[in-house]
Regions:
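C-terminal, charged and often intrinsically disordered regions of DNA end-processing helicases
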Residues: 1-111, 309-311
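Metal-dependent nuclease catalytic regions and adjoining charged, substrate-binding loops involved
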Residues: 13, 17, 21, 224-311
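Glycine- and acidic
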Residues: 63-67, 82-91, 105-108, 128-137, ...
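Active-site-adjacent bridging/hinge elements
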Residues: 73-83, 121-122, 188-199
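Hydrophobic (often cysteine-bearing) scaffold residues that line and stabilize catalytic clefts
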Residues: 79, 94, 98, 102, ...
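Short, polar/flexible loop-turn hinges at active-site or ligand-entry regions and domain interfaces
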Residues: 88-95, 114-115, 207-210, 231-233, ...
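A non-catalytic, helix-rich entry segment at domain boundaries
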Residues: 101-174
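Mg2+/Mn2+-dependent nuclease catalytic core
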Residues: 169-269
Length: 311
């Protein structure tokens, strides 16, 4: 039997609102609400209250901040992007902390003199408790994989043909409504004086070559080059491309995905359209391969976990 609580009584009365007892049920609910029973107040019922606002996030010509990674994630699922932007994210995972550490060690190779692979590995081991405070074989295996990432990075660093301009370089450029801000892992210049952006990835699985050519994160970097985002470090505003370098891929050979020189006019229009959508009042939820591990699926209207009780 249903427990004899005020919430249960109200629930029974609400279920009667669609029956021949509707008039009596409504009168009792009204009386309970006037007596201070919160669950009897229709304004507390999910699906009854009006939207708090229908105004766009960024009205008119107000700029919209677009990071290179958010441009990519927004096109995958606008709802996920909005919920995460609004605070719907978990704390940093060990994988995220490790990724940040590997990027920092890769930057040290350029920023400090006398850095060798052995030095980087030693720094990693000394700071491991900060990355993964757990003990046991799982942590040990993770550390071995991290050391392998450093080895792969060193192979790339020693064999690359372009000159390093700088590492961990921030940029801030404006394209229409979009204010593109971010940081590149590494900026290189080729023999012709053109700039090439490198983004290190610690994930294991590279995207396809076709997806790399359309990757919005890399396109954003190339737009930043063209818009003078790195003129403080190098005079060139000509891009010769960009690449994702996968340090976590379990093979001896460095796995990379390059993006050739883009059509700047088309890329700018693409980013501007994304900025317009990011500043809108509504966001579309989309089903894709990342739904299974999505941290905000409990709020997603197209997933069972996130549907409202009133459709």
């Amino acid at each position: 039997p249903r427990p004899s609580t005020t919430a249960a009584v109200v629930a029974d009365l609400r279920s009667s609102l669609q029956s021949e007892k509707a008039t009596d049920a409504a009168a009792i609910i009204k009386s309970l609400s006037e007596s201070g029973i919160h669950s009897a107040d229709p304004q507390s019922w999910t699906g009854v209250a009006q939207l708090s606002t229908t105004e766009p996030i960024s009205p008119g010509n107000a700029p919209v901040a677009v990071s290179p990674s958010s441009a990519e994630s927004f096109t995958e699922c606008g709802m996920k992007w909005f919920l995460e932007k609004s605070g719907g994210t978990d704390g940093d995972s060990i994988a995220q902390v490790l990724g940040s550490a590997i990027h920092a060690f890769a930057a040290l190779m350029v920023q400090e003199e006398g850095i060798t692979e052995a030095v980087l590995v030693e720094k990693l081991k000394k700071s491991w408790n900060l990355i993964d405070p757990q003990e046991g074989w799982v942590s040990k295996t993770s550390q071995e994989k991290a050391i392998a990432m450093i080895t792969r990075f060193m192979k790339y660093h020693m064999k690359h043909e372009r000159e390093v301009v700088g590492v961990e370089l921030g940029f801030d450029v404006t394209v229409g409504k979009a204010r593109i801000r971010g940081t590149v892992d590494r900026l290189e210049v080729d023999s012709a004086g053109n700039l090439f952006v490198i983004d290190f990835k610690t994930s294991k699985t590279p995207i396809s070559y076709e997806k790399a050519e359309q990757n919005l994160q890399l396109k954003s970097y190339q737009i930043a080059v063209a818009e003078g985002g790195f003129t403080a470090q190098h005079a060139s505003t000509t891009s010769s491309g960009a690449a994702l370098i996968y340090l976590g891929h379990d093979i001896q050979k460095i796995s990379s995905r390059e993006q050739g020189v883009i059509n700047l006019e088309e890329a700018r229009a693409e980013i501007e359209n994304i900025a317009q959508s990011m500043g809108a009042a509504q966001f579309v939820a989309a089903t894709n391969s990342r739904c299974k591990e999505c941290p905000v699926k409990s709020s997603c209207p197209i997933k069972a976990e996130g549907r409202t009780v009133i459709e």
